[in-house]
């Protein structure tokens, strides 16, 4: 059985390491990138089953990455979970609307 593929997009290397270690232990095939530009390229090339996407990143924000993913035919159906320390209702609403 093929492992489910997860694209982990997180610019904080300490957090990324914790997430990846746990996901590896659970048997997932995890690819890590640390900015929005790399995330867009990896989403098309890696074809993950799920993307764990940090909202606040350098170069391209997670919100902008999600918007691009949803408007790109090859990535529109990939499931995405946003990760963020943002706590304002407007931030949650923005992510949900994408």
Identify the residue ranges that each predicted region occupies:
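Conserved Asp/Asn-Gly motif in the active-site loop of CheY-like receiver
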Residues: 33-37, 92
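Hydrophobic residue at a beta-alpha junction
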Residues: 33-34, 57-60, 69
């Amino acid at each position: 059985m093929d492992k489910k593929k997860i694209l982990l997009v997180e610019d904080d290397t300490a957090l990324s390491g914790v997430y990846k270690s746990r996901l590896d232990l659970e048997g997932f095939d995890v690819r890590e990138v640390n900015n929005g530009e790399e995330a867009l390229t990896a989403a098309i090339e890696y074809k993950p089953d799920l993307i764990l996407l940090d909202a606040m990143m350098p170069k391209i924000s997670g919100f902008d990455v999600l918007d691009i993913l949803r408007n790109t035919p090859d990535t529109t159906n990939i499931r995405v979970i946003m990760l963020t320390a943002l706590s304002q209702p407007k931030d949650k609403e923005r992510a949900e609307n994408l």
